[in-house]
């Protein structure tokens, strides 16, 4: 049996819009609704495998005109969608046209009516229909030949309705659905039904009397309030039924030839998806789209390179692409042009040949991974110059999610064998070189920071950090005992045992058993929230709150670190984390498997966990940490000459800020005043509000607001700088670091307040954090060479670098680290300060 799929266009688009808030192209064009629609539609088309596809659309302004003649209050009170909702509709329509999915809209009829008309037309032809919608009105269209796929919430929760499933769920037949709606009404459409009658009562009435007419024919059998409601609501019930009924006789005909699923223009679809930066969706397109007849004839032929065995004495070019296929980890491919490539077993290539190859530029998708792959085969080589394709892609567009070779090259064929990947690498490299030649600042960041630091990152990953798992186990036993004590104390307070890790059970204990106040506490489907923000509001109300917070702190540390870290130990007894350059859009390094950067440093327990990380036998740790790094860089970027002078004169910046803000001398500054100044000095860089300052210092909101106002009077260049950054973000669509690393800022124009506010904070933060990241990478590059043979860098966390060395070399290593890190960038007008410490474990440093 052939199958027709009809999509309720605006309904599905609406769900996509709110499921993907803030999604946009690099130039700021919003695309969340389009992405959500296409993503869902693709998956459903793959699942349902239709022969025909059509889209029903609500014509703006005129689609409900006829129903409003019947009931002027129909759909009254609905808020208009944001501007960027309508801004995306032409984009979606263009894409639907490329898909070959005809769009139908008509005056005076809604999308439901169009769907109903098409379903009946299909039924008369013996064609099955699947209706895709989030509007449950469509359930009245269910028949042996028509199914409804209803989106419940988001994009993934879809309910398939057949006649059998409908009856099982509602307890009535599909032909009774319209009468159900007539009785209970529909608040979303502003249809009253019978006021006071809900779904349960309506279902019960229909189970007994079959129809709305049957209910009123037996009205004398009802008593009391129910009878009164039915009597008073008779007119509104029948009006609701009339308005809610889907008009399947809508004057519109489906063109079956146009709706044929094989009418897709795949080349145009690919072009549009690439323009929208939806590269990941291209590979997900159904085969029926990719192999449409008009595309089979024009399928492009790739110029696949000729693969030859690597000769004994190869003449390498100045630029060579190296590729290792994960399915053949012991085989390497080397290509200097797109026409040919050499291949060989890694173990068969001599060290002298590697050294010869290393003299030129080595291009790879992931250079760090290439180093690891070669190291696994005992190859010790450092390339003179590298080009990391994925890192270059990140520099060019840090918001781009898909940086696979398929996405970067625009080639989404299924063949990912080595020859095809080499073709893609050549194409991407050529395009990236052109981009870099036209964007000197981005090129500088690549050549001076991101590419050279890859060697240092590889070395740190290879070295790893030694873990004292015995100490960790001992700590785990102690914490487990404390957790048990906390549980017993909480059980005693509650009067019974419960699962303290269950939000639902905890909510029951706090708000039902202990009767804690619920004013201002968020409430969800499972009860009142027990999140940290809500617990903060309850602090002091009952001693169990402090126990819960301690319990959560301990159980998180146990599961995240104490139990997890030993499982991640390699056979050498060390933890080998992975350092990523292309995760945070500021350019900061991140750490995964495990994330060593997130181990708490300011808590006693966090420091204890750090004590389990120890140096290699016979060595000690030396750590160097930039002091007030971000604030110094803020002074530079803002051009705050006064603040720069204070830093260069080693003035206590926080005390000076407090003195100037409060209008007193430095000698008169109290500890609390200095603390407030310290909080705002750093917090202002992240857009701290009066509420945030009040929460961090204990000030009242009024005091905090006054303090911030005075602060910006003293630090006018900082205020002007932050304002300038936001203006640049809005007008130019990006912000950048001191050295030219860029971050696109499309969301600063979002109509969603939360999305826009978050984007503004990120925009203010990025130039400072990004400059910090650039300088840290430069310091790592310098130290990797300066400390060679003397100390090994093993970890980088935000503003600090950790190395291990012999005890007798500590002083020399410390001096080198301090000198190199403080002098990392002589062009800066400010003096950088580095504190150096040493210890027998990470916690001591």
Regions found by a protein language model. Name each.
Residues 4-5, 9, 15-54, 68, ...:
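Conserved RNase H-like, two-metal-ion catalytic cores of nucleic-acid enzymes
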Residues 130-132, 138-174, 352-436, 443, ...:
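Charged catalytic and DNA/RNA-contacting regions of genome-maintenance
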């Amino acid at each position: 049996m052939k199958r027709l799929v009809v999509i309720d266009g605006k309904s599905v688009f609406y769900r996509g819009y709110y499921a993907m808030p803030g999604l946009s192209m690099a130039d700021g064009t919003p695309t969340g609704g389009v992405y959500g629609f296409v993503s869902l539609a693709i998956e459903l088309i793959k699942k349902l495998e239709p022969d025909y596809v059509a889209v029903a659309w609500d014509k703006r302004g005129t689609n409900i005109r006829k129903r409003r003649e019947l009931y002027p209050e129909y759909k009254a009170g609905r808020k208009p969608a944001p501007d960027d909702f309508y801004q995306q509709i032409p984009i979606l329509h263009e894409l639907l046209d490329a898909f070959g999915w005809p769009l139908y809209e008509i005056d005076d009829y809604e999308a439901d009516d169009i769907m109903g008309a098409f379903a009946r037309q299909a039924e008369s032809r013996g064609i099955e229909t699947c209706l895709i919608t989030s509007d449950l009105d469509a359930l009245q269209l269910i028949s042996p030949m028509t199914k409804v796929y209803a989106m419940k919430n988001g994009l993934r929760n879809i309910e398939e309705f057949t006649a059998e499933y409908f009856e099982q769920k509602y307890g009535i037949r599909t032909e009774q659905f319209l009468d159900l709606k007539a009785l209970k009404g529909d608040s979303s459409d502003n249809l009253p039904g019978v006021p006071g009658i809900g779904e349960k009562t309506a279902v019960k009435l229909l189970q007994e009397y079959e129809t709305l007419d049957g209910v009123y024919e037996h009205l004398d059998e009802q008593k009391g309030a129910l009878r009164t409601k039915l009597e008073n609501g008779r007119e509104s019930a029948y009006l609701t039924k009339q308005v809610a009924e889907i008009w399947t006789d809508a004057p519109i005909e489906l063109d079956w030839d146009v709706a044929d699923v094989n009418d897709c223009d795949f080349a145009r679809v690919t072009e549009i998806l690439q323009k929208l930066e939806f590269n990941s969706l291209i590979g997900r397109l159904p085969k029926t789209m990719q192999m449409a007849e008009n595309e089979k004839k024009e399928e492009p032929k790739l110029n696949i390179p000729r693969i030859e065995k690597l000769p004994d004495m190869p003449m390498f070019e100045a630029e060579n692409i190296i590729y290792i296929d994960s399915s053949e980890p012991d085989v390497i491919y080397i290509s200097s042009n797109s026409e040919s490539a050499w291949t060989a077993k890694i173990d068969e290539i001599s060290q002298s040949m590697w050294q010869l190859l290393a003299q030129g530029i080595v291009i790879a998708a992931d250079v760090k991974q290439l180093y690891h792959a070669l190291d696994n085969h005992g190859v010790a080589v450092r390339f003179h110059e590298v080009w990391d394709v994925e890192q270059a892609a990140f520099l060019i567009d840090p918001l781009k999610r898909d940086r696979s070779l398929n996405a970067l090259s625009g080639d989404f064929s299924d063949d990912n064998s080595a020859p095809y990947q080499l073709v893609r690498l050549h194409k991407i490299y050529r395009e990236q070189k052109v981009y870099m030649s036209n964007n000197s600042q981005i090129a500088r960041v690549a050549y001076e920071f991101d590419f050279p630091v890859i060697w240092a990152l590889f070395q740190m990953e290879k070295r790893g950090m030694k873990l004292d798992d015995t100490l960790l186990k001992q700590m785990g036993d102690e914490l487990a005992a404390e957790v048990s004590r906390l549980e017993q104390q909480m059980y005693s307070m509650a009067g019974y045992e419960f699962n303290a890790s269950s939000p639902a059970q905890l909510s029951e204990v706090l708000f039902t058993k202990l009767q804690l106040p619920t004013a201002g506490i968020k409430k969800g489907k499972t009860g009142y929230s027990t999140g940290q923000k809500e617990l903060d509001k309850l602090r002091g109300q009952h001693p169990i709150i402090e126990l819960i917070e301690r319990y959560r702190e301990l159980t998180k540390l146990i599961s995240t670190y104490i139990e997890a870290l030993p499982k991640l130990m390699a056979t050498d007894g060390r933890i080998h984390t992975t350092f990523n350059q292309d995760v945070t859009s500021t350019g900061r390094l991140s750490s995964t498997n495990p994330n060593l950067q997130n181990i708490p440093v300011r808590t006693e327990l966090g420091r204890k966990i750090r004590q389990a990380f120890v140096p290699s036998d016979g060595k000690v740790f030396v750590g160097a940490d930039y002091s007030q790094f971000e604030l110094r860089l803020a002074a530079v970027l803002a051009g705050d000459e006064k603040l720069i002078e204070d830093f260069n004169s080693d003035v206590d910046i926080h005390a000076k800020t407090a003195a100037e803000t409060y209008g007193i001398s430095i000698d008169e500054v109290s500890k609390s005043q200095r603390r407030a100044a310290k909080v705002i000095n750093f917090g202002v860089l992240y857009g701290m509000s009066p509420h945030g300052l009040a929460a961090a210092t204990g000030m009242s909101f009024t005091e905090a607001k006054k303090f911030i106002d005075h602060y910006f009077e003293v630090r006018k260049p900082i205020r002007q700088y932050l304002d300038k950054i936001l203006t640049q973000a809005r007008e130019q669509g990006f912000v950048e670091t001191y050295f030219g690393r860029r971050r696109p800022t499309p969301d600063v124009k979002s109509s969603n307040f939360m999305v826009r506010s978050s984007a503004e904070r990120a925009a203010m933060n990025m130039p400072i954090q990004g400059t910090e990241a650039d300088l840290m990478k430069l310091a790592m590059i310098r130290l990797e060479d300066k400390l060679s043979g003397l100390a090994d860098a093993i970890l980088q966390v935000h503003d600090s670098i950790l190395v291990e060395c012999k005890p007798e070399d500590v002083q020399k290593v410390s001096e080198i680290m301090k000198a190199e890190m403080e002098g990392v960038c002589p062009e800066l007008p400010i003096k950088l300060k580095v504190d150096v410490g040493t210890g027998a474990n990470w916690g001591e440093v």
